[in-house]
From Swiss-Prot:
GO function term, MF aspect, one: calcium ion binding
Signal peptide feature range: 1-89
Species of provenance: Staphylococcus aureus (strain MRSA252)
Residue positions assigned to the propeptide: 1313-1351
The gene coding this protein: sasA
Pfam families with a match to the protein in the record: Gram_pos_anchor (PF00746), KxYKxGKxW_sig (PF19258), Lectin_L-type_dom (PF18483)
Membrane topology per record: Peptidoglycan-anchor
Organism ancestry: Bacteria, Bacillati, Bacillota, Bacilli, Bacillales
Name under which the protein is recorded: Serine-rich adhesin for platelets
Region ranges (Non-repeat region (NRR)): 231-751
Source taxon at top rank: Bacteria
PTM field: Proteolytically cleaved by a metalloprotease.
Amino acid sequence: MSKRQKEFHDSLANEKTRVRLYKSGKNWVKSGIKEIEMFKIMGLPFISHSLVSQDNQSISKKITGYGLKTTAVIGGAFTVNMLHDQQAFAASDAPLTSELNTQSETVGNQNSTTIEASTSTTDSTSVTKNSSSEQTSNSDTVSSEKSENVTSTTNSTSNQQEKLTSTSESTSPKNTTSSSDTKSVTSISSTDQQTNTSTNQSTASNTTSQSTTPASANLNKTSTTSTSTAPIKLRTFSRLAMSTFASAATTSAVTANTITVNKDNLKQYMTTSGNATYDQSTGIVTLTQDAYSQKGAITLGTRIDSNKSFHFSGKVNLGNKYEGNGNGGDGIGFAFSPGVLGETGLNGAAVGIGGLSNAFGFKLDTYHNTSKPNAAAKANADPSNVAGGGAFGAFVTTDSYGVATTYTSSSAADNAAKLKVQPTNNTFQDFDINYNGDTKVMTVTYAGQTWTRNISDWIAKSGTTNFSLSMTASTGGATNLQQVQFGTFEYTESAVTQVRYVDVTTGKDIIPPKTYSGNVDQVVTIDNQQSALTAKGYNYTSVDSSYASTYNDTNKTVKMTNAGQSVTYYFTDVKAPTVTVGNQTIEVGKTMNPIVLTTTDNGTGTVTNTVTGLPSGLSYDSATNSIIGTPTKIGQSTVTVVSTDQANNKSTTTFTINVVDTTAPTVTPIGDQSSEVYSPISPIKIATQDNSGNAVTNTVTGLPSGLTFDSTNNTISGTPTNIGTSTITIVSTDASGNKTTTTFKYEVTRNSMSDSVSTSGSTQQSQSVSTSKADSQSASTSTSGSIVVSTSASTSKSTSVSLSDSVSASKSLSTSESNSVSSSTSTSLVNSQSVSSSMSGSVSKSTSLSDSISNSSSTEKSESLSTSTSDSLRTSTSLSDSVSMSTSGSLSKSQSLSTSTSDSASTSQSVSDSTSNSISTSESLSESASTSDSISISNSIANSQSASTSKSDSQSTSISLSTSDSKSMSTSESLSDSTSTSDSVSGSLSIATSQSVSTSSSDSMSTSEMISDSMSTSGSLAASDSKSMSVSSSMSTSQSGSTSESLSDSISTSDSDSKSLSLSTSQSGSTSTSTSTSSSVRTSESQSTSGSMSASQFDSTSISTSFSDSTSDSKSASTASSESISQSVSTSTSGSTSGSTSTSTSESLSMSGSDSTSVSDSTSMSESDSTSVSMSQDKSDSTSISDSESVSTSTSMSLSTSDSTSTSESLSTSMSGSQSISDSTSTSMSNSTSMSNSTSTSMSGSTSTSESNSMHPSDSMSMHHTHSTSTSRSSSEATTSTSESQSTLSATSEVTKHNGTPAQSEKRLPDTGDSIKQNGLLGGVMTLLVGLGLMKRKKKKDENDQDDSQA
């Protein structure tokens, strides 16, 4: 043996005499050397050692066994320490172990010890909770006394995982009585290791021990008291057997298996049969339903040791019927039988007890058997003291034949008695069976009513101390619902052998333990489960049968004994664990559902998993054995799991985790937006987010013009240029191709800035055929001389919107040569309705100076006889209302130099006889009313020859755009008295400025009949110098009604040479009917050079939005035919000089209508070479941005056929009073007939190319490009006229303007649509420049005239 073991052996040999004294505080205490030596070898495992026992200080026997682990020894020693009543420790020499203080006195010196006799009572309570061990404690204490020696031996065994038996020997000089009362709580649980502590005390001591282990289920209470008077020397041997396996998988002797049955584990220990059912939730066993001929029972699976106490606590329901109250039956019997496990008695009168040999028990009977039933019933008649109706309770015994007898006694304690609480309403009543194994007294309590009896005689009669238990109920001809509700049932098993199957590595049960039960001395074959466990991956290692002395390993049998036995089989785990997990697909950026690694292991230990290769963002949680987290990167990863069990068996499992992105990116919603045109917008941020964390690509479509998308910053910005509402679509795409589409609306509203670019193209074809035939006869005599003063008052209401202004200056040099011969007679009636819509705007200033030299030659044959003298004064008032809408406003200022040469040949013959020298005063009162519906017939013969030379200079600037639609109704009444004589030479200079807004559409029908007699003598020389400037910008629709009243009274004598200067300004709304026939031959070559200077200052605001798309192609065909016949007879005699006053009132009602069909096909070609030099100084505060696109295509075809016939009747009544002095009388009669047929064919071709460039040093930029091609060919001859012309004009204009201060350029008016343009300055400047040009032109002409006269 080892050195330490030898020292331990020696310490045991000298245990009685060797003590150690040491000081604890002020006191001296003693400690056995055994304790000190034992702890010298603590923690050293050993396989076997010998304990030598020696009589009178010698040890003669060596025993071997298994040792305990170091932790078990420490636990045992600690418990010993607790069980010894410590008294004191020296402050300077604290002992390593507890002090074996056996009621010792304080030692005053080191030489004497006094020990007194005492009585020892030991109460031991052990509490364990839910561990994997079973603990059964049987404590037997034998105490022997003699005057000199007392030896106390305690045998304690338990089926813990460790085995601990202690052996002690001691001597006490006095009598001792030892009493032990041990209470322990234990059960089956899953704790790996436990420490069981057994305490043996041989000297008379008073010790209380309480040990707590982590388990609790069963309560074992053992009370043992014994005394002895003979001197006895007892020795118990402790087998410190330590397992050689890694864990202390121990077996314990099952000498006292205390079982607690409750509703939760009832099925583990008890079995139902027959009609019985069990409800675990309530713990109720229903033995019979409320039905006939039923039997149900519940039996205990193991035997009850009658030497140990047992206790049943619960409730019983006997139903709601009993004898005398519905004849209920049969009752419930509780039987204790020495027979076979699971055996039950008969039903009926036997109440589950009869039929069992040498059994005993207690019954609750609801049916009284007054007479003895038949022999097969195995029951005698019930006693008479419980007859007369009502349920009763009583003890019952059976004989060897199984015939049951209801026990009666003279003592009320155990005599049969009726129940104080009869069954009602299926109510549960408390029921309790309490048996004391020491006194053999059984006490039964039902609803507070008690029966008590000592059943030791029945136990002796049965021939055994081990009994099976059954609870039985039945019904026959009477019924009842009969139930037992379990509370707890505590008992001690007997004649059982427990077999465990333990993992050698972990020390845990591989499969639940099996309990074999039977009768004492019965041989039972047990199964080591080797085949089944091999299939589970275990190899058989060894068996421990140290607590089953009757075990035969060869035959695998065990012989049952009163004491419980235990056999343990050990197995080694050789199978690696497995992990079940499938390939996974998860979404990036989202917290995943945990991937649980389902680990399966045949072993009882824990499995450790090592996980590698996880995707970014994931981790392994060993506590839950799952993979958790949020993946952050897309891709596929191979994950490896290495699983290792406690036996170091390993397995490797791989699977894939594919991180994908199937979620489309999210876009922060963008609400509908709006802004003003030409106003920069605040950037619109497109906020996107993707679960992958990667960048998102945005594609934006449907942006309004002027806005752009910046993909770098994901913003929409810019300046919108078009008014309107757009739907913007955003398509957001992540790296995986997932798309999200978002839309919102963007509205661009009006602002003070706009852009316009206009492109228009027009093609027009026109063809006209006109045929006219006229017969006219006329005789006329007239003398007239007139001065007309006309006053016109016009009121016009107009609405005008102008969308563009432009300023242009040009200087042109034009040379024109023309030769023309024309002769035409035509009558045509044309009714034209035209609707034109144009969106254009220009403002131009132009000054033109033109010189023209014209030579003309004409031949004319004319015969006329006329004498006329007339003076008249006319005053008219006109009122017109018009509404116009204009899209064009223009101001032109131009200066041009033009030279024209015209050759004309004219032949005229004239016969005139006129004598007029008169002074006349005439008063005339005329009243006329006319109604006409006539056909006019006219016959005239005229022969005229005339020779004339004409020279004219003209300067004209006219811009006119007009569309008019008017209807007029007029009534005119005229009263006139006039006398006139005229022989005049007149020269006139007129400056006319007209602004007209006209839209005309007229329907007319006229009927006239004319009778005239006139005589006129006239001689005239006309020189005309005319300069006119016309500015017209009009688009009007007018309806007018006019009433004209005229009153004139005049006396005039004229023989005058007059010059006339007239300045007229007209604003008119007109209704027009046109009749035209034309035939021309024209060849034009022009070259113009113009120079201009302009100064302008204007403020303007232009809001222009132009959208135009038109194509024009028109064809028209017109055929007009008219026939007119008129006859006229006029006789006039007048005095030569007259003063005339006339008052004229006229009312006229005129309705006209015209229809026309025009076919025109013309081609014009023009060639021009123009050089323009322009100097311009502008001061402008306006900014106008115009961008307009216009494509115009128009196709029209019209066919018109007009036939007209007019009939006129006129009735005139005239009253006049006149006073005249006249020296001449003239009578003229004339008949003329004229018939003219003409045919004219005209073809013209011209080519015109014009290109103009201008530069303005201002804030404005203007660019014009014009290309024109014109070809004209013309030939004509008298008679029938056919005209074809075709022209093509293409113009492209682009204007860009800037307006800086729109607020100053336009004043807002109420919503009338009117707009005030501050262009008065421009008008004044224009007028000034025109005046200067005219004065310069006049001065130049005068100089030329002076040069001619000097020449």
